[in-house]
Regions:
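Beta-strand/loop-dominated core regions that host nucleotide or nucleotide-derived cofactor-binding catalytic loops
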Residues: 17-115
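An interfacial alpha-helical scaffold signature
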Residues: 2-18, 111-384
Length: 384
């Protein structure tokens, strides 16, 4: 059924995906690491949901790090070496694994990790999906709960809708002023209405298959703050209402998360503080490693430079202070005496990507004289 409210979309840009039922990979799997055993080599243990084989996989760590490894060894619950494990306990060994990593609550998966939504790819949220499978077993663990809600608010979801205007294809589009978006709702036990959102097309298909024949499935991709905005303080939402694993958030729980310090630091008003370097302070400075987080931030910085003609240069380095705290140092050359307003805008444009490294530092090109000896490569962005 439809909810009794309709959202106006006044010239807003939406990531729209219509009838894009991407091929379901039958061997999709997640495994949340429960422990680590050294049996001549490091083996990660946990319950597999789906089918894991000796293949290339992604390991998502709770500190935001992402590794791409190859499964070299699979041991089933009886202790036998095997080629695959389906929906069962397993021990997994990898080629070239770093024994010094903290593997607690790391997620092993062959589902694509997406640090940001991409309308040209099927939406995937493997970490929150894997955490959903294990919620009932770990909800009393504070570390698990903190990780669970962090991933919930940082994920992007498929929201099924019906629009008053017909569209073709998929991608990012600017909706016309009078476009109406009808939001679907489902009724839970006790007569509670909830907004259904989905982690991926596999979960959405479980619901769409229950719809009428020839039903035109229209979806938009929304972040957690977007979903909260749709609710406007009323009611709750349910993730994957028809499986593979569901989770309901009522309005009280949503309010508790939105008002938490962690959420406000991630999505609230950005605060820029002036830092004065201490005399004799030792820092490490170099180029950040090539990974999904760094690549996505670089892309945003280049786009920001292209959108502001007064910006002459943007570069990005990795800074590590004496305590081991990491930050990305964004170096700018701007034809404006009030550079702080740009810092805030740059931070807001990149903050949702900060997972492994959660801080951004800023310096003008003049202030960054200390970094010139390290800046061996062409700048990330230079105005033509």
């Amino acid at each position: 059924m439809f909810w009794d409210k309709i959202k106006d979309a006044f010239s807003s840009e939406k990531s729209v995906d219509y009838n894009k039922e991407n091929k379901v990979v039958k061997s999709r799997f997640t495994m949340l690491v429960k422990g680590c055993k050294d049996e001549g080599s490091i083996l990660l243990v946990g319950d597999v949901y789906g089918t894991v084989k000796k293949e290339d996989v992604t390991v998502l760590f709770k500190d935001g790090k992402v590794s791409h490894l190859k499964v070299a060894k699979l041991i089933d619950s009886t202790g036998n070496d095997c080629e695959s494990v389906t929906d069962a306990y397993a021990k997994i060994g990898f080629e070239n694994i770093d024994k010094g990593e903290d593997f607690k609550y790391a997620l092993i998966t062959n589902i694509d990790f997406q640090i940001e939504s991409d309308v040209n790819k099927a939406v995937e949220n493997p970490y929150i999906l894997g955490l959903l499978y294990e919620y009932d077993n770990n909800y009393n663990d504070e570390d698990f709960i903190n990780l669970f809600f962090r991933e919930m608010v940082m994920s992007h979801y498929l929201l099924p809708v019906r629009m008053s205007e017909d569209f073709k294809g998929s991608g990012s589009t600017v909706l016309k002023k009078d476009t109406k978006i009808d939001i679907y709702g489902i009724e839970l036990q006790g007569g509670i209405n909830a907004l259904p959102v989905f982690t991926d097309w596999t979960a959405l298909k479980n619901w769409s298959d229950k719809g009428p024949a020839n039903w035109k499935m229209e979806t938009i991709i929304e972040s957690f703050p977007d979903i909260v905005g749709f609710l406007k303080g009323e009611g709750g939402f349910i993730i994957n209402p028809y499986g593979p694993q569901s989770f309901y958030m009522n309005s009280e729980s949503i309010s508790s998360i939105v008002n938490s310090p962690g959420y406000q630091s991630q999505f609230g008003d950005a605060k820029i503080e002036t830092k004065v370097a201490k005399g004799g302070e030792k820092i490490f400075l170099g180029y950040p490693p090539d990974n999904e987080e760094v690549a996505a931030i670089k892309k945003r910085l280049v786009a920001f430079g292209n959108a502001h003609s007064e910006i002459n240069l943007i570069d990005m380095m990795l800074r590590v202070d004496e305590t081991g705290t990491k930050s990305y140092l964004v170096i700018t050359d701007i034809d404006d005496s009030d550079v702080r307003k740009y810092y805030k805008d740059i931070y807001n444009s990149c903050r949702d990507l900060l997972r492994e490294v959660v801080y951004l530092d800023f310096a003008t090109l003049e202030q960054a004289d200390f970094a010139k000896n390290m800046m061996k490569q062409p700048p990330l962005y230079r105005k033509n």
